[in-house]
């Protein structure tokens, strides 16, 4: 096989852009959709083949998805990278952004190690329709179980991680002070407003009023930047969300990162398992989704860049035009998906996606396991 069509590239690019971020498994859909269509699609788009132009295409759409994540969270990544650089320079973590950067690195280590060791055998042995369908069903079960446990812990009033405060409280962790204007214990003239997460300039614009008496740490614990009160509302909300995430204990961030390794199996969603892991550690749906997106960015980008030689080498011959087209489609769809999901998780859960995975996975098990 020497190439695949632009139609195939456009459809799979759109699927990758959406399913990488929706908790429904991009790799699973990349296996199942061509197999369901059959014919030339099944022959051209076989992810389990050891030498295939489709692998070069998958590399390109992954890089495009990572680029969309970076663009959507551009302001956040600028602060996170700056915080990391400052912490390296000073040899200690003094800001919430710096601490969040190290938590992301910590959460990336497990999937980096496991991916380097097992990505190829997992893809070649499990990248077939029936295993992908089974894992897609398992993915739905995991998300349903996670949502049920989350509801149960919320009903019982179980506390979140130490130092973590969800979007219903002033989202400034005690463990990551920032420099600037001092905040006293005297109540403010009006209620403070804490917003949910928003990617970059961010779509999240719903707010909740809270009182300083119950939510604001004492003056000796935290300071606020002078310029923060003049920031746009969405950027202030994004900073607050990052501070909540920066309050996660290191072990919790590591556990979320370990959960991400399950996504190496086709059918298991990276964003889905990391979100459920975040919920299990006490994060809100909005913050769990935000952390999943931030954690996925370096992993997806690194996976794409490591295999870029495949695209530039013989595997990419004859498909570079289709690959560029598919990558553009994937990037646009991924960006739209990020903004949609940021709004979705402000008020909703992952249950509809879990039900979809259960139904679609079960039907595909019947299709490829029996017929």
From Swiss-Prot:
One of its GO terms (cellular component) is plasma membrane. One of its GO terms (molecular function) is undecaprenyl-diphosphatase activity. It is an enzyme of class 3 (hydrolase). It is found in: Cell membrane. It holds the Pfam family BacA. Coiled coil: none annotated. Residues 152-226 are annotated as: Disordered. The keyword Cell membrane applies. Keywords: Antibiotic resistance, Cell membrane, Cell shape, Cell wall biogenesis/degradation, Hydrolase, Membrane, Peptidoglycan synthesis, Transmembrane, Transmembrane helix. One of its GO terms (biological process) is regulation of cell shape. The chain crosses the membrane at residues 53-73, 100-120, 126-146, 291-311, 322-342, 351-371. The keyword Ligase does not apply. It catalyses: di-trans,octa-cis-undecaprenyl diphosphate + H2O = di-trans,octa-cis-undecaprenyl phosphate + phosphate + H(+). Its EC number is 3.6.1.27. Belongs to the UppP family. Bacitracin is thought to be involved in the inhibition of peptidoglycan synthesis by sequestering undecaprenyl diphosphate, thereby reducing the pool of lipid carrier available. Catalyzes the dephosphorylation of undecaprenyl diphosphate (UPP). Confers resistance to bacitracin. This is Undecaprenyl-diphosphatase 1.
């Amino acid at each position: 096989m020497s190439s695949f069509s632009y139609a195939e590239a456009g459809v799979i690019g759109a699927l990758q852009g959406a399913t990488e971020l929706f908790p429904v498994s991009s790799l699973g859909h990349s296996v199942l959709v061509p197999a369901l269509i059959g014919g030339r699609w099944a022959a051209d788009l076989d992810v389990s083949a050891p030498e295939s132009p489709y692998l070069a295409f998958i590399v390109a759409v992954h890089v495009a998805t990572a680029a969309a994540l970076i663009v959507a969270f551009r302001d956040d990544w600028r602060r996170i990278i700056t915080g990391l650089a400052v912490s390296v320079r000073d040899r200690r973590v003094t800001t919430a952004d710096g601490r969040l950067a190290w938590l992301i690195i910590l959460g990336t280590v497990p999937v980096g190690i496991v991916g380097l060791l097992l990505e190829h055998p997992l893809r070649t042995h499990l990248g077939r329709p029936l295993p992908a369908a089974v894992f897609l069903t398992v993915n739905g079960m995991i998300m349903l179980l996670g949502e049920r446990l989350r509801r149960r812990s919320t009903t019982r009033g179980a506390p979140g991680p130490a130092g973590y405060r969800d979007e219903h409280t002033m989202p400034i962790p005690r463990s990551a002070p920032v420099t600037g204007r001092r905040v006293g214990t005297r109540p403010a003239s009006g209620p403070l407003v804490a917003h949910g997460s928003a990617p970059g300039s961010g779509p999240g614009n719903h707010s909740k009023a809270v009182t300083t008496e119950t939510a604001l740490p004492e003056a000796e614990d935290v300071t606020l930047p002078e310029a923060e009160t003049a920031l746009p509302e969405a950027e202030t909300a994004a900073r607050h969300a990052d501070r909540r995430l920066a309050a996660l204990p290191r072990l919790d961030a590591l556990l979320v990162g370990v959960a991400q390794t399950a996504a190496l199996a086709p059918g298991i969603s990276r964003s889905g398992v990391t979100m459920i892991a975040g919920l299990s550690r006490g994060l809100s749906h909005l913050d769990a989704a935000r952390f999943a997106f931030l954690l996925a960015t370096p992993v997806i980008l690194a996976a794409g860049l490591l295999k870029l030689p495949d695209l530039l080498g013989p595997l990419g011959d004859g498909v570079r035009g289709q690959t560029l087209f598919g990558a553009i489609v994937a990037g646009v769809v991924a960006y739209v998906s990020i903004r949609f999901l940021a709004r979705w998780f402000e008020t909703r859960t992952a249950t509809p996606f879990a039900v979809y995975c259960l139904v679609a996975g079960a039907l595909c098990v019947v299709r490829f396991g029996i017929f």
